[in-house]
């Protein structure tokens, strides 16, 4: 077998000297891998987990990015089949912020197309015997079934020890396969909703680079060091770019600002780091995320050392777009009044047109073989259920009158429901 498992080697750069101390030569390779084929039916979303190929010799990942390609290797744009998000993990290795999970998350990318690139002299250690896996969510905006592949390009250094980095995953809803939450959207114009997650640093080091991930309605991700009383980095969304049609979800940022620093942001053992996700709260935003992945080079840090200048890939940040997502299929069937719930089968809701009184606690009973959910598209208050299969239930109490338009986020063109909540 070749030194790299079943990969397409697209370029081998000239050997370069990196690291600290006496100059040495390291072979830096640009390697291209592909996942297995993923088939997505029209106007549906799909999630997949898979073991994937990785470098089969010991070395260091110094950069990585991902996209979707067709069978000929052509890039598939977001307006056709969207790489909504993809997470790469090293199977069997403990995760930094979710140590009970034996899958170390070391890179992720979404609609914002973040590409990780470490400063010279640093790398994410990888053994030839390590195994990689991915979790991907794709959305097909086309009327036909399409098969695509996740292509990931890895910059890989061998032949010399680099200073190792550790990936730190900060997440508003950590340690879940689908770490979403909902912004209710019940505030006045200009109001915001903030959610926070804290991490007490178990070791000292320097943060060399970081990128963020948000969904529609996102305003900013703020990484701060509460021990030192300072903001370390703010990742801001950009919204300029083509909007995939038809809309299968609220459009997310086309870019999130990221930073890189060869000196690194100093953090000391015991420091309380906080990531704050800020969303618009003037209208509902469902199934949102607030995630940042940062790369730490462990080293001694004495207290609250000065933060160096950062090289920031800013983009063109601005306020989130206000785009109403329509129901792609009109709910049908008789109007069901004052019922307390309904069933959810494969690709349909039992009662699609419902009228209930304010204060009703409504329960969806899942009976399908495949995962489905209940997600608000537009309405007075944002809410959603987890992906659920047969035997599961989800309940919501309607406290505000109005029209609630719902769909299954995995099958938005096939599964729709409208619930009218009356005052009396």
Question: How would you name each of these model-derived features?
Answer:
Residues 2-26:
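Secretory targeting and sorting signals
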Residues 2-3, 218-222, 416-418:
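Short amphipathic alpha-helical segments with coiled-coil-like heptad repeat character
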Residues 11-13, 17-19, 39-41, 62, ...:
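N-terminal non-cleavable signal-anchor helices
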Residues 27-204, 211-324:
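Beta-strand-centric surfaces of beta-sandwich/beta-rich domains
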Residues 210-211, 365:
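Short, conserved beta-strand edge motifs with alternating hydrophobic and charged residues
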